Amino acid sequence: MTVTYTARVANARFGGFSQLLLLWRGSIYKLLWRELLCFLGFYMALSAAYRFVLTEGQKRYFEKLVIYCDQYASLIPVSFVLGFYVTLVVNRWWSQYLCMPLPDALMCVVAGTVHGRDDRGRLYRRTLMRYAGLSAVLILRSVSTAVFKRFPTIDHVVEAGFMTREERKKFENLNSSYNKYWVPCVWFSNLAAQARREGRIRDNSALKLLLEELNVFRGKCGMLFHYDWISVPLVYTQVVTIALYSYFLACLIGRQFLDPAQGYKDHDLDLCVPIFTLLQFFFYAGWLKVAEQLINPFGEDDDDFETNFLIDRNFQVSMLAVDEMYDDLAVLEKDLYWDAAEARAPYTAATVFQLRQPSFQGSTFDITLAKEDMQFQRLDGLDGPMGEAPGDFLQRLLPAGAGMVAGGPLGRRLSFLLRKNSCVSEASTGASCSCAVVPEGAAPECSCGDPLLDPGLPEPEAPPPAGPEPLTLIPGPVEPFSIVTMPGPRGPAPPWLPSPIGEEEENLA
């Protein structure tokens, strides 16, 4: 019962969707023509009464009523409630389709895990898939009117071959008042366990895989049952329906054409048929009809699911896969492209133009950069962001005014760190201390002991303010230093890196 028009819209062309307007089966005209005729009939009856039946005084009162209804009908949020409602219904409709129990994955697992070409092996495989099909039939006849008309009783299910008479007795003897669509799945599990004990299923991993696929199949059957049980809340459906009907009830009065001689605003024309009001009714009422048709896709409407077709298809292909196709393989041969370095299937004359189109390499494949933008930049000696001196980061971490007094302990230590980590020139950085270059295995001797790491060393004196003459540092007595190994000689500082010596010490002083 599904209306398929996919081939008609395979290619976008002039008037592509316009051709679909001429279809009748599954169309909005087929759903809405009765309501549209009723609305037009009521409208014309009121218009005729206004023109030919009412007295002059009654006409003036009716005209005031028309203006009032036309003014306040727009307060009803028809578009708002219809938009949310139809979106909810369409999402629910697609989710129900995704829950249709298809046996394709299950039949492949059965064919690959239940072994035996004898009649016993065939019996196991066919019975397992028959149980899966029986579970689908039982749930579909519970939710679909089309399937229920096909299998109105369990006797019809037995006569169709989905259930044996012995299985029917066991099915009916189960003391349960709930829907028993799950019973064939339990039979499936018991039969699979028996096949494992007999060695038809060779290991527990295969049995686990088989039962996992069964649980997926059973879960879809259960979701169909719950979708049928739990509907869209009734209050939501009622609100949408009342909003639509009350809006067009107000339009029956408020959209009447009044006598132009009375001089009412926006009533300069006197037409008999309200063209745009009918179009508005067609759109809004058709919108509600879409939700009405999709809210339960297991009925007998033109666009409802083909449940009986699915039952026939699933039963046939499942039996074909586990019986006739079991262990049926073609002779292994080398493929056509066995010795080809690049395998490519041929193209017909209608599709060969696609070979001339370049393959997609990525969205950044065609981006070009200037030559200077592709040069790597040296980042040696940078511990912070670009353009920031090494001491700036330490100074930003200190609170305002803390240790900035010349001669203070914190100020002297910060000044020492600035002198130690700064890069002045290639000569000064190449031989900043005597421990930088020592023979391998010899103990380094350095006169630049770190007062932060060795509390026994005296703290250095505060440097004098930077003057016109360069600052000269006189090292103290040489003492062995074994706590921290000084780094090796550095390369020359980049020209864009400013030296913090002088300016930093002036600020600290």
Curated annotation (Swiss-Prot):
Which ranges sit in the Extracellular compartment? Answer: 52-60, 256-274
UniProt tissue specificity: Mainly confined to the retinal pigment epithelium. Expressed in colon.
Annotated membrane-spanning segments are 32-51, 61-82, 239-255, 275-288
Any one of the GO BP annotations:
membrane depolarization
Pfam families, per the entry: Bestrophin (PF01062)
Q: Which GO molecular function annotations are given, in alphabetical order?
A: bicarbonate channel activity; chloride channel activity; intracellularly ligand-gated monoatomic ion channel activity; ligand-gated monoatomic anion channel activity; ligand-gated monoatomic cation channel activity; metal ion binding
Superkingdom classification of source: Eukaryota
Any keyword Transport? yes
Where is it chiefly localized?
membrane
- Where located? Cell membrane; Basolateral cell membrane
Effect seen on changing residue 304 to A: Does not affect expression level. Does not affect interaction with GLUL. Does not affect tethering of GLUL to the membrane. Impairs channel activity
Annotated residues that bind Ca(2+) are located at 10, 293, 296, 301, 304
The keyword Transport appears for this protein: yes
Q: Cytoplasmic side of the membrane: what ranges? A: 1-31, 83-238, 289-509
Q: Which membrane topology describes this protein? A: Multi-pass membrane protein
Coiled-coil ranges (or none):
none
Q: Which GO terms describe its cellular component?
A: basolateral plasma membrane; chloride channel complex; cilium; plasma membrane
Q: What is known of its domains?
A: The C-terminal auto-inhibitory segment (AS) modulates the open/closed conformation of the channel and determines paralog specificity among bestrophins. In a closed conformation, the C-terminal auto-inhibitory segment constricts the channel concentrically by wrapping around the channel periphery in an inter-protomer manner.
> To which protein family does this belong?
Belongs to the anion channel-forming bestrophin (TC 1.A.46) family. Calcium-sensitive chloride channel subfamily.
Oligomer and partners: Pentamer. Interacts with GLUL; this interaction tethers a fraction of GLUL to the membrane, causing a decrease of cytosolic glutamine synthase (GS) activity and inhibits the chloride channel activity of BEST2 by affecting the gating at the aperture in the absence of intracellular glutamate.
Q: What is this protein called?
A: Bestrophin-2a
Which species expresses this protein natively? Homo sapiens (Human)
